Swiss-Prot record:
Superkingdom of origin: Bacteria
Functional pathway: Amine and polyamine biosynthesis; putrescine biosynthesis via agmatine pathway; putrescine from agmatine: step 1/1
Single biological process term from Gene Ontology: putrescine biosynthetic process from arginine, via agmatine
Name of the gene this protein is made from: speB
Name of the featured protein: Agmatinase
EC number, UniProt record: 3.5.3.11
Cofactor: Mn(2+)
């Protein structure tokens, strides 16, 4: 099957099923798309249960449950009438070669950004965010990070490819500014001296959504923002299908409201990662991820309609 980059893809996990039944475009660089969806079926950097490579396919498949609603509640307009969104399928790389994946994903992102496109990416494990940050920083300069997760992923363990080290590496490479970055939903140990503002799950669950969003806006300011959502930010009651679930997380309702509240930020790139459908129940994790991805597109469409 010829897919992204006109490469022959014999992968057992890549998927050419368009998100929301959106049109597939395997050469999105020359398209008139505003936003391009890319799947990255990669889970070699996981430290927990593997299976995130099947995440993009699961998100796309369950998104058919969302495609029917045109004037989506509570937005009351059709995102597809304001944004031109295409799905370019999955990144093709030699399975087992983490370096090739990283280099190809960064090159793909750089080419899209140079063509004036914006990216919504489906992982895969969370390591895929690092090559995306490298590409976005080349185009937009140093960015703020808004990061939803149960873990800070700022661990300095010396591994080059590890889904728990990206946000230790990214500041050192000058890709993001921790002083203007926020990590939301954290409920595992972390280094309190890394510069990031951490809004742990306890306080995010206890505070009002408006209060949390006001603090995020104050910290981020007018910097370009990269938005990354690890599905294990949600409590396992709402997202069991992930590699490293942690009890005590956000509800899907609260997460959606928080994402909607980010509408006024200068978001330049977005991803949803760490869906591992082998551990899912009734596709609820994939549905949560697909819904959050759709809400991310809606906050972009809402700005375009203003």
């Amino acid at each position: 099957m010829s897919t992204l980059g006109h490469q022959y893809d014999n992968s057992l996990v890549s998927n050419a099923f368009g998100f929301l039944r959106l049109p597939m475009n395997f050469q999105p660089y020359d398209s008139d798309a505003d936003w391009v969806i890319t799947g990255v079926p990669f889970d070699m950097a996981t430290s927990g249960r593997a299976g995130g490579r099947h995440g993009p396919a699961a998100i796309r498949q369950v998104s058919t449950n969302l495609a029917w609603e045109h004037n989506r509640f509570p937005w009351n307009f059709d995102m597809r009438e304001r944004l031109n969104v295409v799905d370019c399928g999955d990144l093709v790389y030699a399975f087992g070669d983490a370096r090739e994946m990283s280099e190809k994903l960064q090159a793909h992102a750089e080419k899209l950004l140079a063509a004036g496109k914006r990216m919504l990416t489906f992982g895969g494990d969370h390591f895929v965010t690092l090559p995306l940050l490298r590409a976005h920083a080349k185009h937009f300069g140093k960015m703020a990070l808004v990061h939803f997760d149960a873990h800070t992923d700022t661990y300095a363990n010396g591994c080059e490819f590890d889904h728990g080290t990206m946000f230790y590496t990214a500041p050192k490479e000058g890709l993001i500014d921790p002083n203007h970055s926020v990590q939301i939903g954290i409920r595992t140990e972390f280094d309190k001296d890394n510069g990031f503002t951490v809004l742990d799950a306890c306080q995010v669950n206890d505070r009002s959504v408006d209060d949390v969003i006001a603090q995020v806006k104050q910290i981020v300011g007018d910097m370009p923002v990269y938005l990354t959502f690890d599905i294990d930010c949600l409590d396992p009651a709402f997202a069991p299908g992930t590699g490293t679930p942690v009890i005590g997380g956000l509800t899907s309702d609260r997460a959606i409201k928080l994402v909607r509240g980010l509408k006024d930020l200068n978001i330049v790139g977005m991803d949803v990662v760490e869906v591992a459908p082998a551990y899912d129940q009734s596709e609820i994790t994939a549905l949560a991820a697909a819904t959050l991805a759709l809400e991310m597109l809606y906050i972009q469409a809402a700005k375009k309609g203003e």
